[in-house]
């Protein structure tokens, strides 16, 4: 019996630190998978190293057609949301998406994110949104991260 208790406790320790991506208000879609290059999903936060570029993808299913898709990114530090400017916010260009997006289909959005040397070494909750032509969130994903 003690052996099973030890195994259960060890499993809780492993899963307690596992990285979780959470939905932050998806309206017309649902993300099914998030993959971040070099991210250790056994940790509570994804480590983003300064002066590198991170590649990632989000798989999602769409419940309504979208004629245009815009990427909006914020970083939340100490409860304060700060916008993250993107060189190309048009998610229909160079991101694996071809607009218009059809309803009841699945898609993979891909992006690269520069982690600049000037960024402070801090824990941040990255809020990644894909918005439709009306500004409604198709998907909204929160990614716990730590800049090092």
Swiss-Prot record:
| Record: glycosylation sites | 51
Q: In which tissues is it expressed?
A: Broadly expressed with a higher level of expression in many tissues, including midgut, salivary gland and ventral nerve cord.
Q: List the GO terms this entry assigns under cellular component, sorted alphabetically.
A: extracellular space
- What CDD domains does the entry give? Npc2_like
**Gene3D superfamilies per UniProt:** 2.60.40.770
Please list the disulfide bridges.
24-140, 39-46, 92-99
Record's signal peptide:
1-16
Tell me the null mutant phenotype.
Answer: Abnormal sterol distribution in many cells, also lower than normal ecdysteroid levels. Npc2a and Npc2b double mutants undergo apoptotic neurodegeneration.
Cited InterPro entries: Ig_E-set, ML_dom, ML_Npc2-like, NPC2-like
Protein name in UniProt? NPC intracellular cholesterol transporter 2 homolog a
